[in-house]
Amino acid sequence: MKKTILIILLLIFSCVEHKFFFRVSPDGKYEVEYKAHGDKDDLIDFDFTMPTGRKWKINSTLDETEAESYDYTAHRSFKRDEAFPKTFYNGDSLYFESLLIHPLKVKHSNWLFWETYLFEGKFMGRKVKSKYPLIGELIKDTENPPDGWMKEALEYLLTETLHQSNIEWNTLPIITAELKNWINTDLQAVNDSTLFEEIDYYKSLGLDIIMHPASPNIYNEMDSIFKTLEDELQITLDLIDDNFEFQLILPGILEYTNADSLAGDTLFWLFQLGDYMNEDYIFSASSGISYSGRQKWGIIIMLILVVLFIGIKLRKR
């Protein structure tokens, strides 16, 4: 039973490499180059949507004939302090709450005597441990999937849908009790391989239990909530074996970074789902350029102004 699920999981989780290279110019503008390499289906799914649109210069082998792996590159120039996209998804079939969100900013400040550069971003945590702990174990070791991980996931989807839905107070306890009874009896009696193969059937049974007693007026709301949660879970699972590498070159002298490594003037961050499956994965760096010549002239000008000010005061006396 476990071997069957393992084989299916290994077929599903194919490795994809995502690489971002950021080069920040002294004037605050920055260039971004994205490279992806891996299985075609995993490249075009929604776990990590790739950059698209007219602002990006794109080269791709996705349209070529069958191959073991494919490549996708995208390049774009950003203006000073222009925000980096929180997500590259621009469709309408997924809710924002389901997506992998990656806010990032490159901030440049010019103080005349010095300039500062800040690179700061994060991959928003997926909160796996608090939602479905057994999937956290699966992420850590896909070759040994824990017993009951799909039951736990389905239970979360149904109970959380029930919790978020605007169900009448006198109906909610009844539905909660019925769902709990079904989970503890019927669902628990299903082995992992059967549930894996017939997940749509058991999902429909669970949805019938929580939706049938509720008012038809909130059916669409409940469907939307369940879809949001289900897509969120699917995206998290699809992110298994997606590896990320961020490279960065900042102007000036490096002042702070939490990068994994530094080679020459290039900073590197390497991470995967295990690094953000619960909490945010944060990457940051800052640098500065100090203009000693401007500072000296600034001091001289300041002294001259002070002398002039004192002289004017003395003359008035």
What residue ranges belong to the model's regions?
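Start-of-domain marker
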Residues: 16-74
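Sec-dependent signal peptide recognition
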Residues: 2-8
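Short, intrinsically disordered low-complexity segments
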Residues: 1-2, 314
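C-terminal membrane-anchoring or membrane-association module
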Residues: 307-317
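Mature, soluble, non-transmembrane domains
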Residues: 59-303, 311
